[in-house]
């Protein structure tokens, strides 16, 4: 099948584009990434992360379901050497849509109560404050077109560790504004986590580049500019 000249197809990033090309390889697909407001310019009450004990906090946010890969993150945390794991804190935020995944997180919290934490829900101001204070966000999704909480981290200059099966992975410059691991492999994720935990100064130094990534791809201004260009090209 072919598209008429008046039909234009857009996707939110390389991961969604690849999925569309798997069934329609001849389609020309433009990139149109959503825009998020600059939450860093807003005022919000501080969210208490004293439970992290001053250690770098690694955060994942999202409903517990197989697609989101919380089990992969759990397994990666378990694979860390004890002396490495205790240098960091880990927070899972999300509603337990899948009981087996919730059980995996609960077991992890029980085994490492001073290191791993779970919150069912945080209010929007709390999420913003969390992103402002955390060291890194982790997205272990098996399939995720463009995870919003990772973008929210970028707004505050926070690097991410993401699966290759995320749209974010296609935009990351490795070691500059984030890290990508492959094959949904907990061992690979554990190795990236270990590096990040042992080099917190590198995470902090990535702040400016992470912020640039937000401004270039995810800001409202970037979205409006891309949409305007696409409309002009379609009607010109």
Each model region followed by its residue ranges:
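A short, active-site helix/loop in glycosyltransferases that binds the activated sugar's phosphate group
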Residues: 2-29, 36-38
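Conserved donor-binding/catalytic core segment of Leloir-type glycosyltransferases
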Residues: 10, 50-68, 74-77, 91
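Short, structured helix-loop element that forms part of the nucleotide-activated donor/catalytic region
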Residues: 16-21, 91-113, 126
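Short alpha-helical donor nucleotide-sugar binding micro-motif in glycosyltransferases
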Residues: 121, 129-134
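Aromatic "clamp/platform" in nucleotide-sugar-dependent glycosyltransferases that forms part
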Residues: 142
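Conserved acidic donor-binding segment of nucleotide-sugar-dependent glycosyltransferases
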Residues: 174-175, 179-186, 195-200
């Amino acid at each position: 099948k072919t598209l008429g000249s008046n039909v234009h197809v857009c996707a939110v990033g390389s991961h969604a584009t690849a999925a569309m090309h798997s069934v329609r390889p001849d389609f020309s697909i433009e990139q149109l990434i959503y825009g998020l407001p600059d939450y860093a310019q807003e005022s919000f009450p501080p969210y208490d992360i004293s439970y992290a004990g001053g250690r770098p906090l690694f955060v994942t946010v999202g409903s517990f379901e197989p697609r989101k890969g919380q089990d992969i993150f759990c397994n990666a945390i378990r694979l860390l050497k004890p002396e490495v794991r205790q240098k960091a804190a880990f927070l899972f935020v999300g509603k337990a849509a899948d009981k087996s995944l919730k059980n995996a997180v609960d077991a992890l919290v029980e085994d490492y109560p001073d290191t791993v934490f779970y919150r069912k829900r945080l209010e929007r101001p709390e999420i913003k404050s969390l992103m402002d204070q955390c060291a890194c966000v982790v997205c272990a999704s098996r399939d995720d077109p463009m995870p919003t909480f990772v973008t929210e981290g970028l707004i505050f200059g926070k690097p991410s560790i993401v699966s290759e099966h995320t749209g974010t992975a296609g935009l990351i410059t490795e070691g500059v504004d984030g890290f990508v691991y492959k094959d949904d492999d907990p061992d690979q994720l554990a190795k990236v986590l270990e590096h990040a935990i042992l080099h917190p100064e590198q995470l902090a130094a990535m702040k400016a580049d992470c912020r640039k990534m937000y401004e270039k791809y995810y800001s409202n201004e970037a979205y409006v500019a891309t949409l305007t260009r696409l409309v002009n090209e379609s009607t010109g």
